[in-house]
Amino acid sequence: HVNLQGLDKGEVVNSLTMIDVISRALNPYTQNDEFMKLAEQPEMRFVISNTTEAGIAFDPTCKLEDAPASSYPGKLTQLLYHRFKTFNGDKTKGLIIFPCELIFLNGHKLKETIYQYIDLWNLGNEFKTWFEEACGVYATLVDRIVPGFPRKDIAAIKEKIQYDDNLVVQAEIFHLWVIEAPQEVAKEFPADKAGLNVLFVPSEAPYHERKVTLLNGPHTVLSPVAYLSGVNIVRDACQHEVIGKYIHKVMFDELMETLNLPKEELKKFAEDVLERFNNPFVDHAVTSIMLNSFPKYETRDLPGLKTYLERKGELPKGLVLGLAAIITYYKGGVRADGAEIVPNDAPEIMNLLKELWATGCTKKVTEGVLGAEFIWGEDLNKIPGLTEAVKADLDSIQEKGMLETVKGIL
């Protein structure tokens, strides 16, 4: 069963659906012969994987005669080679492959790794050409929060379905699958026609950028702002009368302005993200998001800050305040409610912040953090007006507190 929990257009949904389309499961480590026989089925056409980010990797110790190869791309190469031989290189027997691992351009990476195995195992040019011409490996982007097995709800679920299902999976309502593939692939695999949020697109790059910018970007700045205001859960931050407005400003007025996708599409995506942040079933602690905040800001928010400045001729106040909040969080100490502030990051970042805050001078703190090229890959003091803006926010947070500082930019 799949247990979907969350908000859908503002309504609370908690559904249970039986999955009845899986005919069997094979373990290639104990049933390798049956696993390889799959390649002999003429009607076989699609391969879909999610072996995590670490799964698409080349292991040079894998051998063709291993039963099976230890790596996923190794097993897939064995399967493809067996199919190639079974059907004597018939070009109509190629496979369409959709890797779902969260790696940018995962299809390209998987394809490269298969080529490495073809060369390592000397499988020949004929097979290489068949793989190139008869098979398609397509880049995808998946987006859905899947907490997995619902430990705390499983007794109630078993009571409801009246049998022992130990494979229940819990997930949020929102789902998106972007597939970088031509229209003929969409015709063969019309998942978008089944009422699912599946998009076939010429390039997944803008969607990858959209997710990183509009979902991960706001997470990174809202977390320290919320935490230093005494708010611990993402949902509570969204519903807070001041921080909620701050999150909205960062998403809709700042980050959205830096992306090159249709406005309506971005607006819809941002509204979906807010609904996900408001999920009554997921208590997402802001402290878990704040782990490694500096590298996260560098990849998720800094590109938006630069693009906004370039396009608007001024700095985005919300993103600047987010950076000041991160720097303040790394000062440590205690919150107004007495909770101890315990930042967590790479030792060199922790040591730098400790050293800078020990000076007691916000100018030195600002210049020191923005000038740390090992964090940013450049000196951010060179961005016009940034040093002054971050210092002003740091001063305001020290003097008036976080909430009053946030009110000042709304």
Language model feature labels by segment:
Residues 1-410:
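Substrate/ligand-engaging "lid" and interaction regions
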